[in-house]
Design a protein with these regions (language model features):
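Conserved long hydrophobic alpha-helices within structured protein cores
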Residues: 47-48, 81, 108-126, 236, ...
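Catalytic cores of nucleotide-enabled group-transfer and carboxylate-activating enzymes in metabolic
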Residues: 23-24, 35, 46-61, 65-78, ...
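A conserved beta-strand-loop-helix scaffold within acyl/acetyltransferase catalytic domains
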Residues: 38-69, 75, 83-92, 207-255
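A common structural microfeature
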Residues: 30, 68-70, 80-82, 97-101
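Short amphipathic alpha-helix that is part of the acyltransferase structural core
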Residues: 2-58, 180-215, 244
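Active-site donor-binding loop signature of nucleotide-sugar glycosyltransferases
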Residues: 26, 87, 171, 189-192, ...
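Acyl-donor-binding surface of acyltransferase catalytic domains
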Residues: 1-13, 87-183
Length: 255
């Protein structure tokens, strides 16, 4: 049965023999999250993070309520996995999109934790939709790399199908070709007083793209506080006088 807590509707916790589950409690859980993520640092498509990064990310979170939308898995009282449901309004489909993230300790992958957690993520998303957005369109969504074949099999068996494919591409920095700019366009850095203009131009440029959303103010605050991605000294901004004509927001992951 679902339960009510602090005006939230809570889906029942996952159940899996040999493991215990609980919801997120407080920032004291952040270090466990870092340890779980970093156990996979040598895997393909790895994520690199730190306690500072996690703290900054969760300081401005709005797409989730951690106490409602996050669950940890434990074995022998040790945290070995966590997951979080999130939601955003998607203009292009006129729907609430319920996505999720999940990190499982490298040593505990393939033990059934992923499937148990995905089931809970879907249940909690349904609770959130019925409580907050009843009557509106809603759908489950997830981005997965092809290297995560087990998770792909799980979601396919649960009725998901691929709607879009993305490619990660890389090249070295040698012999980068030069292309002349159109007349009247100049490239220069953005000043601190123009960071909001850069953000707004970026959001506007993507409104016609597949899966476009309108980010809340908290995402701007998260963006300017995350030094792994917010590195304006590396940006290449094309200006048409005062308006922004285009941009490449370069960054070097410092973690």
């Amino acid at each position: 049965m679902e339960s009510q807590n602090n005006n939230y509707t809570l889906a029942p916790l996952p159940r899996l023999a040999g493991f215990n589950f609980r919801r997120f409690e407080d920032p004291g859980d952040y270090q466990a999250m870092v340890d779980i993520i970093m156990s996979n640092v040598d895997d393909p498509n790895n994520t690199v993070t730190s306690l500072k990064d996690i703290t900054a990310d969760y300081a401005n979170i709005t797409e989730s309520v951690p106490a409602r939308d996050m669950v940890f898995a434990f074995h022998a009282e040790q945290p070995i996995a966590y997951c979080r449901s999130a939601s955003q309004w998607e203009e292009s489909s006129n729907s609430w999109i319920y996505g999720w993230l999940m990190h499982v300790h490298h040593d505990w992958k393939g033990r059934g934790i992923e499937e148990a957690m995905i089931g809970w993520l879907e249940d909690q998303a349904v609770c959130n939709h019925q409580t907050l957005h009843a009557g509106a369109n809603g759908m489950h969504s997830v981005f997965l790399p092809e290297s995560e074949q087990e998770r792909l099999n799980i979601v396919i068996n649960r009725g998901y199908s691929a709607s879009r494919h993305f490619e990660n591409m890389k090249r070295d920095l040698a012999e980068i070709p030069e292309h002349p700019l159109p007349e009247g366009i100049t490239v220069r850095l953005a000043m601190p007083s123009q960071y909001r203009q850069v953000w707004d131009a970026n959001v506007e440029a993507f409104q016609d793209h597949w899966g476009a959303t309108i980010p809340p103010e908290s995402e701007y605050q998260e963006w300017i506080s995350n030094k792994n991605y917010f590195q304006p000294y590396l940006w290449q901004i094309a200006w048409d006088g005062d308006p922004i004509a285009g941009m490449v927001l370069n960054f070097i992951n410092l973690t």
